[in-house]
Amino acid sequence: MSLSKSTMVLGYWDIRGLAHAIRMLLEFTDTSYEEKRYTCGEAPDYDRSQWLDVKFTLDLDFPNLPYLMDGKNKITQSNAILRYIARKHNMCGETEEEKIRVDIMENQIMDFRMQLIRLCYSPDLEKLKPEYLEQLPGQLKQFSLFLGKFSWFAGEKLTFVDFLTYDVLDQNRMFEPKCLDEFPNLKAFMCRFEALEKIANYMQSDRFLKMPVNNKMAQWGNKRIC
């Protein structure tokens, strides 16, 4: 891989997963980057040797996917990567109120994400799905109330948590297409985000990876088409 010193490298599985918000933020900020995508093998073994063979050779403090390499800076943990990029572009909140809202959303949306991930990777998906869908409106209502009349989740300025939140709400919308219908401000947020020029252009490009959401051992979202 021939890289200039200014080109970041994002490493992750060849899926959407935890890298979707990172990819969108890199695109939105016009960051020069290249991807190293690792492929998981097919059932029943789901061979992960493409990643495991190099996992401990990359000089990462906590070897994991995703990782971001930017010169001497080598970062793991998806939210740490997002914050690293966002700090360069003043997208972590400016006022104390904005920073508090960013901190809350960063963690709340991860909790929400993990609920769907656990469901999608569970062999009991069909058994557990009704319970997930039953509690989904209550969770979405909380996000709707938190957003209120703001344009973005920190207030009137776009921050990195909007990229996270768009991703997780979109996954839930793919899982249950009508789930946002009761929440006009969440639907408006989704449209507003998709209308950002650089995001819209990215979504129309061949770089955009909407599916698969999850890796091959998942029970849902493991294919390249819905």
Question: Which residue ranges define each predicted feature?
Answer:
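GST-like domain detector, emphasizing the conserved glutathione-binding G-site
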Residues: 1-140, 144, 151, 220-221
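Hydrophobic/aromatic-lined pockets within catalytic cores
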Residues: 86, 90, 110, 148, ...
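GST superfamily/GST-like fold recognition
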Residues: 102, 153-182, 187-195, 203
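C-terminal helix/juxtamembrane-tail motif
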Residues: 1-3, 7, 199-226
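Residue-level recognition of oxygen-bearing side chains
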Residues: 80, 185, 198
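Short amphipathic alpha-helical segments embedded in low-complexity Lys/Glu-rich regions
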Residues: 41-43, 120-122, 185, 206-211
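Short, solvent-exposed turn/loop segments enriched in Gly/Ser/Thr/Pro and often Arg
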Residues: 13, 160, 206
